[in-house]
Amino acid sequence: MKPRILALSLVSALVSIAGCRNDSAVDSTLFAVEVMDGVRYVHNFKAQRGERPGARLELLGKIGTLEAKENKDILYDPVDAARLPDGDILILERGGSCVKRYDENHRLISAFGQKGQGPGDFANPFCLRLDRGRDRLYVGHSRVSRFTPDGIYEGGFNREVFAAFGSIGAESETSGMSVLSGARVILPSPPSIWLDSGADKLLSVYDDKGTLIRSFGAVKRYDDPGLMLNANIVKFAADADDNAYVAYAYQNRIDKYSPEGGMIFSADRPLRYEVRNVTKVEIFKSGAMEREFSWPSVSSVTKGISLDRKNRIWVLTFLKQPNRFLTFDEAENWTECLEFEVFDADGILLFKVALPDVPFGNFSIYDDRLYLVDWRHESCVYEYRIVEDN
């Protein structure tokens, strides 16, 4: 039996979505909605504010500098940042295998962690998250480890290693982590549970002991396993009600899932380029020997996702295609390479926010602060205030 598809008129889309949002300012001509099996598919044509920005980023300062002579002013390969309720800033170092804590004036307060495999140690950490109360922090590395803000280790569990697919598998494995209520976490699912079957299980929820609770996340299918893994790498975040927001790194797709793992909406938006994910044959030479390899060729769409205090979805979108290292050359102006697209909790594109011209690899949002983490160039973290435009 074919899925039942209900195409909503723009007027009824406005009534159904804006009505539940208690927001009468939505222009229904700027998006369309269709409903299939209870899931809303939102097609954004333009941002609600057009080309007018809805916010700007005000630089408050920078933590870490290459020219520093004292250890307190140096960050060793920072990869993530978070903000505690009192304004203190936590920065996760991959190179230093530790978490450093700074006050709101960017002065170092304390640090904890070391490289190793023991309880509270880190091995190639990539992600730092706070729980809903922001009184527990979780570090993603070869394990998931839970700490108090003062660095007291409270427990954790081992992660399944993504052994196959080389750099693609590594990118998928370290694409993110989200913390839910009840000390549960969302992690990328091991390819073994979805890749061969094509089951919709991109992400998995685990309890505090590492027991799998459930898996969810729509998979776009391809014939080549490497391409299917690559094209389905996702960035994700969770709100205070345990809804999960999933942005596909190499697809024009942003999904919202209920706490039970049911899809609520799937949204897209206009891009400046065509999304084309294919398998290409490349020739590798070593001396007189030549070998042909099939390798995925994908279009970069989304670099990251986060939620602000108004439960809006900030998606970091590529304006142009990056180099093979997923970054841009030094001569590039980053303002012209990436931008933030801000959606409401129903998938409607509200406005866009221009990036400052600084290179970075990761970002996070807490309260009215946005952190840009640069591990490749300046080894620093930039702190910005999000200033709303009326």
Language-model segment annotations:
Residues M1-A7:
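Bacterial N-terminal signal peptides that target proteins for export
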Residues L8-S16:
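Bacterial N-terminal signal peptides
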Residues C20-N390:
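Eukaryotic scaffold repeat domains enriched in small/polar residues
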